[in-house]
Amino acid sequence: MAYSYSEKKRIRKSFGKRPQVLNVPYLLTIQLDSYEKFIQRDSDGQQGLEAAFRSVFPIVSNNGSTELQYVSYELGEPVFDVRECQIRGTTYAAPLRVKLRLVTFDREAAAGTVKDIKEQNVYMGEIPLMTDNGTFVINGTERVIVSQLHRSPGVFFDSDKGKTHSSGKVLYNARIIPYRGSWLDFEFDPKDNLYARIDRRRKLPATIILRALGYTTEEILSMFFDKVNFEIQDNKLLMTLVPERLRGETAAFDIEANGKVYVERGRRITARHIRTLEKDGITQIEVPVEYIVGKVAAKDYVDLSTGEVVCPANMEISMEMLAKLSQAGYKEIEVLFTNDLDHGPYISETLRVDPTYDRLSALVEIYRMMRPGEPPTKEAAEALFDNMFFSADRYDLSAVGRMKFNRSLNLEEGVGSGILSNDDITGVMKKLIEIRNGRGEVDDIDHLGNRRIRSVGEMAENQFRIGLVRVERAVRERLSLGDLDGITPQDLINAKPISAAVKEFFGSSQLSQFMDQNNPLSEVTHKRRISALGPGGLTRERAGFEVRDVHTTHYGRLCPIETPEGPNIGLINSLSVYARTNNYGFLETPFRKVVNGQVTEDIEYLSAIEEGNYVIAQANSNLDENFRFTDTYVTCRGEHGESGLYKPEDIHYMDISTQQVVSVAAALIPFLEHDDANRALMGANMQRQAVPTLRADKPLVGTGMEKPIALDSGVAIVAKRGGIVQRVDASRIVVKVNEDETIPGEAGIDIYNLIKYTRSNQNTCINQIPCVNLGEPVARGEILADGPSTDLGELALGQNIRVAFMPWNGYNFEDSMLVSERVVQEDRFTTIHIQELSCVARDTKLGAEEITADIPNVGESALSKLDESGIVYVGAEVKGGDILVGKVTPKGETQLTPEEKLLRAIFGEKASDVKDSSLRVPNGTSGTVIDVQVFTRDGVEKDKRALEIEEMQLKEAKKDLTEELEILEAGLFTRVRNLLIEGGVSEAELDKVAREKWLEQTLDDEAKQNQLEQLAEQHEELRKEFERKLEIKRNKIIQGDDLAPGVLKVVKVYLAVRRQIQPGDKMAGRHGNKGVISKINPVEDMPYDENGQPVEIVLNPLGVPSRMNIGQILETHLGLAAKGIGDQINAMIKQQQSVAKLREYIQKAYDLGHGSQSVDLSTFTDEEVMRLAENLRKGLPLATPVFDGAHESEIKGLLELGGLPTSGQITLFDGRTGEKFERPVTVGYMYMLKLNHLVDDKMHARSTGSYSLVTQQPLGGKAQFGGQRFGEMEVWALEAYGAAYTLQEMLTVKSDDVNGRTKMYKNIVDGTHQMEPGMPESFNVLLKEIRALGIDMELDEE
């Protein structure tokens, strides 16, 4: 393949055997697309804001005389950009303005005559906007809205699996779930009666619902039952025969016709008997009269002469009834066909327990159940039932629900509305009865065809609709009050409920989460997370095992590996690499189409519903060069996800890639196929906790997923258009765009500003470093600057470390690690953490708080780092307890002694009126102040420091914009110069004249003169734009800040803390192999090899076999090989060998193995080969894709090429004695991560501090500056030792003996080291508790 200039800098050798058919899709699509549909720059009324407005408007007054109509909406421009919102702590949002039309009808004239129309734009609150990276900035912090996996609307048939009733009888039920509205359930009880529930309330016989729909008993019976006809002829009873219905029954009498006995009495009727009856064309047989007794009449039989109902429908026929019927002149009787096998009499039985008899009584019964205690009226009962299922305002199945409903009932797809029809309800009951009769299957609720994804856009739309409905009620009330003269749409609408609903969703919904910003991977994973929790979802406590388990339909849609450990396991999932959602919200995954055993290039996305009907081959099936399957039988997933062997011609589809199954995080684990699933889960989760190191180091052994993740995460800067790098410094990159990519008439310059040392949500450091040089060509979509944890555009979460697997004096017992001092010296795992500390000056009842350097009772030394405004200098080194911002708070007047009054009068001392409430550095923290920001309320005078900061910001803004203008002007004048030279002006003349005068030249060629004039206009436009931008920037910087009520000033101080690795820090590999550092060992004591090269970390070999994560061993071997090749290249460069030799050696390395990647170095120039070699000196980066990785033979070949033993084991020597260890040791390079569980954040010690109010015992936990709990078991230990005095001390003066501990302090100050323990407070608490029980207990102190 052809590589671009940037790609040639470092090429990762891939061992993947299968070529990539489909590139990894953009990883944040699920977030961006969903919100784009909500915002809808291009209106389509089916979804988003437009749909919400259309569903609520027009709002008509109760008397119909006025209506408020919706015309259109538009979103304005946000006031501040994303970065400014983060600094100021505001929400990044755009104002929503809606054009509404108020129409008044003339009530006297004919209907529909318009009297008056008023149209107006109405402000409806702010809508938060999504940033380019799929996040929201809410109150200055970046948040992510996690997608939710919820039960799809539609109808579900289920059973209790025999768990409800003691007999173990399986009870079936059906549930109609709408998108919004009341749930309707049907269920069988143990007696086989069918019941209905509305909104999970008290159950009613299901036939009440049918009666409420307007059906009579007769209609209900004819809907659910087949009929059997009996004829009365000459006192004989003839039955119409349908032979098929007899199958499986025992004949109650001889079945005979035309003198031939077909089945004798007592014999079972088989299929053979039925065939004979059909062959002979028997349609009627004589039956004994008793046979009809007990059968159920299918309709009402009325005596026509008297009008009396002889036999009502659903009545069992007795001999007397039969006599009455024949007396009334009936020759034919219709009864219901039922049997015990597969035609149960359920509806007939249910009608018998149904207390209602017509529509009204049924509606009243439903009304009583829904609104107990209210007196029902006919209108109220009708309105309630209609509104529940048949009103589009209150009930909506949605397009998804209707599609699922129709599929379930085998109706035509795409037909039907969002409300239920009579046929829908009867259809559900019919199918439920069919299932009870043994025909049909219940649904699998965990099937991904029955669960759908609700993403940001949809949830935001629902919240917005809720807000709109609240507004609708208020508007309708206002319209119905009358007196609408001179009223405008603006007066009617109060936008508060809308913005409140939206704000609540983005600010405090369970699915609106604080973004995990540890590193680029954790950001991407958080945005691709799918949660089953949240509003309308499951709860941790009630979710069973089945919901959490991996389901066959997860294949290629949800990752089976990446899920949290703990109570949320299986409820929070991650999207697989290639998965996406379809229009209905179901997850789908791509497949290659197979036609007649040949795999085509066509790619189709299938959802779980569709996939069940096809046979699908795995991605690693063997194909020949014509893309035909080479095996006679291929392992495939057949129907229902069961795997089996199939012939090539029976296969419909083939997987797209071996990493299709797993998520982004799991796809980063090399040799995942050799790890146990539990450890892989830990590996995937721990990569998200890796802290970005000071210098990112790409993994030597990767999987090829590193680049797409780094690109899509948005932490790096990516070229918008191709071109040549014109300027580079630490804070900006300027690219001169290629001619063919510029828009005619623009300067063709792209300017990229870099983010420098800012704080992430997890207090890690975000910093961008350019990775291109001056004059380099860049293509569109290539990386220009690396962000945190990226190295030349590849994700780099940790460091490549030389490890040895061997025990070392017990320092690697129980997963601990022994680390060499060299790792600390080289700052391999040094990280920068940035903390934000803020100080708020409020207006209190006693007066305003003041930020000042004049603090009472504080010595000079404590104020040495503050300026005259009382704010710390940038660059100051501070430690725990230092003052960062001096602040004083007024305190209440105290009664003064006469002496104090005198002193006050003489010296005018006012200092005692205020108390010190300064912002101090928290205990245990130390660092450097890297930035200070001061926010002042509008109308409050700015202090000196605020004005200095403002001035600096203005200077920077002006410098930035001036530079930008210069760059753009330079580009423009280059084009002017070329144009003038082409037009016949000599270069010498041009050089004499000032640049600005060039634009005044006149050319003979008219076309060229036009171009020149165009460029002159552009130049003028650039100048105006510069002035405009500068003015906007100036206003933003100068204006006061919008602070919370009662806040006058906020000072934010940013501290940077540099943390080196130390004992107690947690580290991990990518295979779930985690541990804590036990000791930092001097380099000279570490084991070393024959070349004198020491290892950097010693790991315990016993941690591997029982955990079954062998991937780490293979990674270690492959890492050694990669480093070995790097060492060889390094040696060749040092020996200054010819480029030809280098090229040959590197080519050999890239050609090794059976991978599908081909790198042809003969197309590289010598300079490019040298630059590639320079980047490979530290090791050849390798990629071993998931489930398609390097084979053992390839690893051995690579080790050989690097001049290393193929066993991967090396003889080591003890650094302390110089003795050889008795057997070779596995040594190699493993990619190690430093996790965000640092000992500095956990270390904590207390001498004195705060106490609990009731028990008077010290508080617990680091955040409260609490003590260590000395619990029950610890007390036992001291009792066992007989350490009585220690125990007494622990339980009294060190805990809750208030007087004792005060005395103890006094004694220590006085220098008498005694303790006088008293009564612990907890005894008094016990006393009070016993008294609360009504027992008077007193302590007698004698």
Swiss-Prot record:
Stored InterPro entries: DNA-dir_RNA_pol_bsu_ext_1_sf, DNA-dir_RNA_pol_bsu_external_1, DNA-dir_RNA_pol_su2, DNA-dir_RNAP_su2_dom, DNA-dir_RNAP_su2_hyb_sf, RNA_pol_bsu_bac, RNA_pol_bsu_CS, RNA_pol_bsu_protrusion
Annotated GO biological process: DNA-templated transcription
GO cellular component, one term: DNA-directed RNA polymerase complex
Keywords: DNA-directed RNA polymerase, Nucleotidyltransferase, Transcription, Transferase
Enzyme class, spelled out: transferase
Entry EC number(s): 2.7.7.6
Protein name per its UniProtKB record: DNA-directed RNA polymerase subunit beta
